[in-house]
Amino acid sequence: MFEARFQSFDDPEPAQTGPRVEALRAELARRGLTGLILPRADRHQNEYVPRCEERLAWLTGFTGSAGTTVVLEDRAALFVDGRYTLQAATQVDSSVFAIVNVGETPPDKWLGQNLKPEAKLGYDPWLHTVDGAEKLARACADAGATLVPAEPNPVDAIWTDRPAPPIGAVTLHDFRYAGEYASSKLNRIRTEVANLRADALVISDPHAVAWAFNIRGSDVAHTPLPIAFAIVPPEGKPALYIDSAKLSNAVRHNLEEIANIRESADFIRELTAFGLTGKTVRLDQATAADALARIVTTSGGKVTRGADPIALMKAVKNPVEIEGAHEAHLRDGVAMTRFLAWLDREAPNGALTEIAAVEALESFRRDTGLLKDVSFPSISGAGPDGAIVHYRVTRATDRPIKPGELFLIDSGGQYEDGTTDITRTVAVGEPTAEMRERFTLVLKGHIAIARAVFPDGTTGAQLDPFARQHLWAAGLDFDHGTGHGVGSYLSVHEGPARISKLGNTPLKRGMILSNEPGYYKTGEYGIRIENLVLVVEGPKVEGGEKPLNAFETLTLVPIDRRLIEMSMLSYDEISWIEIYHARVAAALMPQSDDQTRDWLAAATLPLGQG
């Protein structure tokens, strides 16, 4: 009945872990190296990478979006964060790799405990940031060992059937969606470069390239990125380094008006030539590959470090992008609510599966006529699978959604006017008292973020406890951030702002972030409630001395009333739910079909009714 066109459920190819690790050790020995540290990354430090950059998955079998392995002569470890500990345990051969929670033991600490004096640890300078490489070098030095560049990457030497780099077509991102011409953006960037007293800014982040030049690509699944570099001087045209096979004549003609187009293969040579002149290049040490700094400095140039100015420009949406976000979330809300109504009809018989749910939801989004892609592979977790934070269902793991279980669905869409990301946890049948209690604790944290009022300069780290306070009081917590930034028809995970213990960037008006506290009971169920929120001007307070900010909730989808324990909520919390549901109903009713309208009317009734 339904099908998924933008995501597959194929099982990951079983990694021949033992033979591959032994082949890697042989290659390292041939190069005189004791070991190798390998993160899941590419030259651009992307979170989502092309298939040809999936070295970590090829070597270890782990397919999560974040992780690092260290392979030494006699041992190996895979480092993952709390989102992926359960997934890694099912995908990785524990007889070869020790699975380590990076929050408890980061790689540098592990290296200090396991490297032998005089050891030579290889690293690919393209896959580590400047900061990251320096941290590793210190850890090696403390252990009496040495960090050694390993180029070309040793894994590439043994990965004989490695896929070719992608050649995805580049499209122009129209002004009616971008809200600012590329020429204007580049002028702003040039001004920043001049203010920084640099001779050039190297743009290595494809998100920044896409934003600055008003282009989108198809080199990375679910994120419309063109893999490219750029160099922007304080005056004159920037240079855009991109494979010309990705550019149609029309796109190339448009770009040539604002940039000098170069082949990707020219980038290293021209960056080296730039360094030979002794000029100063600006790099973001937290996001730029260590290889870039090495190229500039070894050729005689200078590197100044600091935050990429484009990251903040991109994160603060302009009025056109904000209006696009409203339109995208309304459209997405219609599709998501249609799905939830359908789910309530189909799930109680116990025959509906996790894959069938994903296929239906994607189909409903495609029915809008404007879906370009999903924004990430949908997380469709029934019962115990919901406790795997970034669970990805495959044909081997697919299971029915059974009565008496919780079903967690985390998904999103890519539209030219905006990117969406939403999680709902749904009761199938009658939930237990514990499920209702835990869900309500999560909901209280979600509401606390949604209702937050905060002064200019407030960071995500300062807001993060709002989402956890009620869970903490019950001796509970969740092992992931509360929120991440979201792009405008770009990545569903966008920096620099986030709501987490590590979120040190002040939140600014125009930023879009997620609000997604959760709770996960291993082997039983998972709970997460996620809406996207927009930072807006806060209320005017009589006698107040500081400008205030607040959040506007963008997502328009009901929250499952069956899981809410009303007695645990304050008057203000109940009021927030009622106002939110009234807003959802008013927005979605006119655009919903008859069956969905009936369901929506019941789903948005005041608490205690129905």
Which stretches of residues belong to each language-model region?
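Active-site neighborhoods and metal-handling regions in enzymes and metal-associated proteins
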Residues: 1-610
